[in-house]
Amino acid sequence: MQDSMDDSLREAEGRQDDSEVSSGTTLGSSTPEDSGVTAKLRKKYQMASALLRRELEELSVYDAKTAGVSGRSSGSGSGGLALLGGRFHVAPLRIPARRRLQTLVVAWHTSSFIYMTVLVLFLAANPLMWWFMVPYMVYYVWNRSPANGGVVRRYSPRLRSLALWRYYCEYYPISLHKSEDLAPTFVPDPRGAEPREWKLRLWLWPTRVELLNLTLQWTRARPQVATGPRYIFGYHPHGVGALGAFGAIATEGCNWSKVFAGIPACLCTLVNQFQIPIYRDYLLGLGCTSVARKNVLKVLEQNYSVCIVVGGAQEALLSRVGSTELVLNKRKGFIKLALETGNVNLVPIYAFGETDCFNVLDTGNESYLRKFQLWIKKTYGFTIPFFFARGVFNYDFGFLPFRNPINVVVGKPVYVDKRRTNPTMEEIDHYHDLYVQELRNVFDKNKHKFGYAGKELKIVE
């Protein structure tokens, strides 16, 4: 019985082998036309493989140890851009979570006005959210905080102290330096803490039997008292987006309130940014306000200091990697504000590395692109240079700034003592010259520390 089963198995295996040989012979035979098609497919496969190998040779993973301090790619070509013949650097998968968070926060800041605009459009288009949007839009039209000094009431230390702003400053990183201690504007109330008391007493009605007699006592810090001068900080250079000014002054990422205790400062920016609902309130909470003259005067009258990016949009067009060109000769409005206010210190700030965070396209002085930029500036009050830097997942092209150190150095104050109702041009020019001289001192005394040795400060306009 066993022998017959073995014979059957051997016969079945033999039939299977014959079938495989037969099928292999059939598949192996081909006509001349089939051979031509196979050759073409093989040739295309080889070409695709060669192209893929060539592209992979140009692809490299970013190495932080060899890429330099700024985080720029070290490959050949303009900015390491593959489209221009250089190497294309992709982000490695193994990156610490803290660096991921830093990139996420910077991506939020650079595009937050877009996200807020999309959010507002979504809320307005969704009938389920009209219960919120209708009263908010009434409030938006009625409230004029960005234009009447109302930022002082909206100034939120809690929003400014969120942990995410430390990630923002660590990304570059941004560092805050002072040339000397500045006298505080606000000091604690000399009367100390204010005692507070709360009582609760219950009687059994209609009798006078006392059921409960509770007294709670505590102390509350009194509001600080304004005794010192106010400050008008001038921030230089503008760069593409005044990134250092936002991190160092509009947030507590660099511990502004500890480095300059008792000097709350409001960062002034274009009024256009306060026309976006919700985004406007977000900026006000951070202490950002309009750079309009009337508004700045209102803020100073309430003993809050302001920071003005003096060069503005015109200086942004001059931004280049390593550039030290400033627009300052014609910018005297902030000097006049100080004279009209009185008891104000003019303090220059220079941010080393501000112009190194983006690659900017040089449009020339006579090109159509430059004329278009100037038309945008004249019509809408702002303009944006054509720039690129890195992306979220690569290090060669995108709109995120490079990880380039920004060192924000605060200079010594130029004191304006008494208030002048109608300051003369001689007075304005006098204080302007003092301000420019102190700004040059800040640059010259610190340029060797922050990689600007051999460069000179250029005031071109």
Swiss-Prot record:
Reaction catalysed by this enzyme: an acyl-CoA + a 1,2-diacyl-sn-glycerol = a triacyl-sn-glycerol + CoA; a 2-acylglycerol + an acyl-CoA = a 1,2-diacyl-sn-glycerol + CoA
Pfam families (UniProt xref): DAGAT
Alphabetical UniProt keywords: Acyltransferase, Endoplasmic reticulum, Glycerol metabolism, Lipid biosynthesis, Lipid droplet, Lipid metabolism, Membrane, Transferase, Transmembrane, Transmembrane helix
Gene Ontology terms: biological process: ceramide metabolic process; glycerol metabolic process; intracellular triglyceride homeostasis; lipid droplet formation; triglyceride biosynthetic process
Parts of the chain that traverse the membrane: 113-133, 231-251, 259-279, 333-353
GO MF assignments: 2-acylglycerol O-acyltransferase activity; diacylglycerol O-acyltransferase activity
Function text: Catalyzes the terminal and only committed step in triacylglycerol (TAG) synthesis by using diacylglycerol (DAG) and fatty acyl-CoA as substrates. Required for storage lipid synthesis. Major DAG esterifying enzyme in stationary phase when TAG production is particularly active. Involved in lipid particle synthesis from the endoplasmic reticulum, promoting localized TAG production at discrete ER subdomains.
Family, similarity comment: Belongs to the diacylglycerol acyltransferase family.
Record's protein name: Diacylglycerol O-acyltransferase 1
Biological source species: Eremothecium gossypii (strain ATCC 10895 / CBS 109.51 / FGSC 9923 / NRRL Y-1056)
Gene encoding the protein: DGA1
